[in-house]
Amino acid sequence: MSHWCPSIFNDIIGPVMIGPSSSHTCGPARIGFLARQLLHHNLKKATVEFARDGAYINMYRGQRSNYGFTSGLLGYRPESYSLHNAFTEAKKRNVEILFQEGDFEATVPNLARLTLESDCGEKVTVYSDSTGGGTVKLLNIDGFDVSVVGDCYEILIFTDNNEDFLAAAIDKLNNIFADNEGFATSSSGEKALINIKRRSNLSPADIAAIKQIGSIEDIKIIEPVLA
């Protein structure tokens, strides 16, 4: 099994980024970069909401969290100078991005909810946390609890919530992807999510093999933001 080496910047000194804040500028940029990949089509609108009693609500402008989220949602990494012109670029692309107070409490200090809509009618809701020093975590995707921190490829397989099927599916997936970094499952009503963590992306053959398992509604891939 192969492993990535730690980065002296991201893991020891601090993130390579456009500032001013690792938690409130770099973190949001990484969150936006990760969340954007949950849409199969082009981003049309994003609503970023902050917990009413959280850290973002009174500082997101001063700490340029709004620039960070916007830049990441447009596909830029936190070290990109494009962060400075994020709003201008969003306007050029006809992408509407709103920032507002949410109706939820801060279960963690830097809790944010992102609701993303594509130009083809897709919609996805993500809860996220900027955990400090530029590190982040996606906590929930469309009602499924997850732990996505951006350090590997996250393969998200949406399927039926059936215990026997899930056990068999995970067994098959484990045989297909013997080099995985781990599996996690989450349920929401009648639906389930299988999350495979890998150090490499999927090939077209890999995707075809997953679909052959049956009862697969969707497959989404999040590429890492940490390197």
Report the location of each language-model feature.
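A structural-propensity feature for long, helix-poor, extended segments
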Residues: 47-92
